[in-house]
Design a protein with these regions (language model features):
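A cross-kingdom marker of C-terminal helix-rich interaction/assembly modules
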Residues: 1-238
Length: 238
């Protein structure tokens, strides 16, 4: 990663173009760091034949790539394709940046400040709201994240195999038959739901699923990260 991209999050709200640039730099380094770490976890899991760990990292890689793609193509591109932006459009762009970087569904301020009672009361309020079919947002959430399934579905409309890949890895990490297969093995006596009896079922699933994962993540992630980097206004740089 180019060191020029490594910028502390210290937005200058008086200059919206520089504010946008600061957000983009932080997003690029965050995406790069997460993708690199997930790949490391995936490779380490395969090395020690922990195929459930492989599937967990794989699903996160798909979700990360899908979210990046969604923001680049469906949020930034319609605005940045314009020759000039109005004041209102510039404000919208910065709001997109903020949601992209700081969106979430967990009250990190309460957690990091050790206000666990607030987390508890928010959880209780959320449960009560769900019973009455209402919605409750925790007090400390700055802006809500985009739903990752929205990102997956937007992509899958153009590339249906993405939904196949995502459904596969979701099934491999949920507590059901998919994840049970990853710790299963078989020999001449039959199928065992333990990893130590003959041929590993998880290894077979890994070999069969890896091409799906590679097609859905490596090149798409690199392409869309480059597009995100290109969203920086160079003429505003010192």
């Amino acid at each position: 990663m180019n060191e020029k991209m490594e910028s502390p999050w210290n937005p200058d709200v008086s200059d919206p173009r520089r504010l946008h640039n600061n957000y983009i730099r932080c997003l690029v380094t965050a995406y790069s760091g997460k993708f690199s770490e997930l790949l490391s976890v995936l490779l380490a899991s395969v090395k020690v034949r922990h195929f459930l760990g492989y599937a967990l990292a794989a699903r996160a890689l798909v979700e990360t790539t899908a979210t990046l793609r969604y923001y680049v193509l469906h949020q930034y591109k319609p605005l940045l394709d314009k020759e000039t932006l109005t004041i209102h459009e510039m404000k919208t762009l910065v709001e997109i940046d903020d949601r992209h970087l700081r969106g979430g569904r967990f009250d990190w301020d309460a957690f990091l400040s050790h206000r666990y009672e607030q987390l508890q009361s928010d959880a209780e309020a959320q449960l009560a709201a769900s019973k009455s079919k209402q919605r409750h947002a925790a007090q400390g959430i700055i802006t809500e994240q985009v739903n990752v399934l929205t990102c997956i579905e937007k992509w899958a409309k153009e590339t249906p195999s993405v939904m196949v890949t995502y459904s596969l890895f979701c099934d491999l990490v949920h507590p059901n038959i998919g994840s049970s297969f990853l710790v299963a093995s078989s020999d001449d006596s039959g199928l065992y739901f333990c990893p130590s009896k003959g041929q590993s079922v998880g290894e077979s699933i890994f070999a069969q699923s890896l091409p799906f994962l590679v097609a859905c993540t490596l090149k798409p992630f690199g392409d869309h990260l480059a597009m995100l980097m290109a969203a920086i206004w160079r003429d505003d740089e010192v």
